[in-house]
A protein has these predicted regions:
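Conserved hydrophobic core/spine positions of the Hanks-type protein kinase catalytic domain
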Residues: 111-118
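ATP-binding glycine-rich loop module of kinase domains
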Residues: 11-17, 22-56
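Protein kinase-like catalytic core scaffold
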Residues: 36, 71, 85, 141-144
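Juxta-kinase regulatory segment immediately upstream of eukaryotic protein kinase catalytic domains
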Residues: 1-15
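C-lobe/activation-segment region of protein kinase-like
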Residues: 121-125, 136-175
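The N-lobe alphaC helix and its flanking beta3-alphaC-beta4 segment of protein kinase-like domains
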Residues: 50-68
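Conserved structural core of kinase catalytic domains
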Residues: 51, 70-109
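Hydrophobic residue at the +6 position relative to the catalytic HRD Asp in the kinase catalytic loop
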Residues: 128-133
């Protein structure tokens, strides 16, 4: 890939696409000896989700989750003009990869339950899909910044947990 993108005038080399979400594309980026996640907001339609200003929403959600105490990468910079966010890169496998490779540990689910206790007390849900969580030094990090008002239907116990092991829902997604 190796193309360049800038954040507030500073250039970053794009190493690879890490993933595409409802709000944007996340790339592994490099500058000097440091690695980052560079997220480019996109405006592609999403059938099941309505957005206002995506960049403002990311900033607002990041601040809210930080205040709640959720373990996640640091938002280092925002580039309003180019609709880009520079985040700390958390090295490690996603929960999705660990489930796929039969390397999941019950401790990761226990850590998520502790995270949920903080979230639910703040009337908040996050996107519990396993690609949004990275394990680094045996600790889970929520690497997406999306959050919403709490709805029981979309909490971890009723929705997210279906994708944290090789359930029919997980296996259907893999196809």
């Amino acid at each position: 890939m190796n193309k360049e993108m800038t954040v507030n005038g500073k250039s970053y080399t794009i190493i690879k696409l890490l993933g595409k979400g409802k709000g944007g594309y996340s790339y592994l980026a490099e500058s000097g000896n440091n690695r980052y996640v560079l997220k480019q907001i996109h405006h592609e339609p999403c059938d099941y989700y309505q957005f206002g200003n995506k960049l403002e929403a990311e900033i607002r959600d990041y601040r809210k989750l930080k205040e709640i105490g959720i373990k996640m990468p640091v938002m280092l910079e925002t580039d309003v003009e180019n609709e880009r966010i520079l985040k700390e890169f958390i090295e490690g496998d996603t929960i999705y990869q660990l489930v796929l490779e039969d390397k999941m540990k019950t401790d990761y689910i226990e850590q998520l339950h502790r995270m949920c206790a903080l979230l639910y007390a703040a009337n908040t849900n996050i996107d519990y899909f396993p690609t949004n969580f990275v394990v680094h030094n045996e600790e889970i990090y929520y690497v997406d910044f999306e959050c919403n008002d709490y709805m029981e239907e979309w909490n971890f116990e009723n929705w997210g947990v279906k994708y944290w092991s090789k359930t029919p829902e997980f296996l259907q997604y893999v196809k």
